[in-house]
A protein has these predicted regions:
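Sec-dependent N-terminal signal peptides
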Residues: 4-13
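Zymogen propeptides
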Residues: 16-138, 143
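Conserved beta-alpha junction segments in alpha/beta enzyme cores
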Residues: 40-43, 48-56, 174-205
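Beta-strand-turn-beta hairpins that frame and shape the catalytic cleft
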Residues: 59-63, 151-152, 200-209
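Short, solvent-exposed aromatic-acidic interface loops
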Residues: 69-76, 159-164, 212-218
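Structural recognition of the beta-strand scaffold that forms the well-ordered cores
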Residues: 107-111, 144-146, 154-155, 200, ...
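Active-site-adjacent helix-turn-beta-strand microarchitecture at beta-sheet edges
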Residues: 110-191
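Conserved, well-ordered active-site substructure
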Residues: 119-138, 188-203, 207-240, 249-286
Length: 286
């Protein structure tokens, strides 16, 4: 984990669009670090702050990832608009997962899928839990983050997903824009800055970086552009990375003890944590 801090430090020193203020690293389990970073971004000629939160996860027999749902059940996810998909804040989803699974310790997690927030709350992409496909359809822009049964993780395009052996998938959630694909930075015409949630993996699939950036609070944090995320994931060492649901959905929640969870970041909605359909949990197998 020290290597990643050195990489980040070198990046922040050399970067022309971001200036570091601190880079605290907290180890919450062997193989799981939380990195926090203060940035300054250049936006419209102004230098503005942005705060980052990153889970640096080395997958192993003990450390893994699980897809979350509103009530920790597969039936919470609906594959059509015929009924509403259940939603809950990520912290509540993690609490429910912890309550129902005493054989694991839930360390924290983030939101994941884009969803139909103005109608049925149906997620826009595919989702798997415990090897079961809960939703197999996806929209044209979908990308997929998956944990495979061999313990490695992948970020893939929809075309790459179609070519996969689906029986190998253990957990999966979906995003949209690919940020890095086969070690190649992906360009975007969008120059807007928003709160962000994103995930990246190393080439061997054994290391996962889960990023949340706060935004929409000028005096506190102003978000990231796609180009910023590309640069960050490349410097982290991601071979593939993709963008998850951001904006008011972006939440980086951690275990605060006694089965309780709370955001380490500051979600941008005035009401606090937004209720969402699903997320990614970082877990320790006891």
């Amino acid at each position: 984990m020290k290597q990643i801090l050195l990489l980040l430090t070198a990046f922040f020193i050399s970067c022309t669009v971001s200036v570091p203020h601190n880079a605290p690293v907290t180890t919450i389990a062997k193989g799981v670090d939380i990195l926090q970073q203060d940035y300054e971004i250049s936006k419209g000629g102004e230098r503005l702050p942005t705060k980052l939160f990153i889970f640096d996860v080395t997958l192993s027999n003990r450390i893994s990832l699980k897809a979350t749902t509103a009530d920790d059940s597969n039936t919470a996810i609906c594959s059509s608009h015929e009924r509403n998909t259940a939603i809950a804040p990520i912290s509540k989803q993690l609490e429910m997962m912890q309550r129902n699974n005493k054989q694991i310790k839930v360390l924290g997690g983030v939101n994941s899928d884009f969803f139909h927030i103005k109608s049925s709350n149906m997620i826009c992409g595919v989702m798997y839990r415990n090897g079961e496909c809960l939703k197999g359809s996806y929209d044209d822009q979908s990308t997929i983050f998956a944990l495979l049964k061999n313990g490695t993780a992948v970020c893939v395009t929809s075309a790459e997903y179609e070519a996969m052996d689906k029986s190998l998938i253990l957990e999966a959630v979906s995003g949209r824009q690919m940020l890095v694909n086969d070690n190649v930075a992906q360009s975007s015409e969008s120059k807007t800055f928003h709160p962000r949630t994103a995930v990246g993996v190393t080439k061997d699939g054994k290391r996962v970086f889960i990023l949340v950036a706060d935004g929409r609070r000028k005096g506190y944090s102003n978000g990231l552009s796609y180009a910023d995320m590309v640069t960050i994931f490349k410097k982290l060492g991601a071979y593939d990375a993709l963008n998850l649901d951001g904006g008011g959905s972006s939440c980086f929640s951690i275990n605060t003890g006694r089965g309780q969870f709370a955001p380490l970041n500051r979600p941008s909605d005035k009401s606090g944590e937004r209720a969402v359909p699903n997320g990614i949990a970082v877990i320790y197998r006891r």
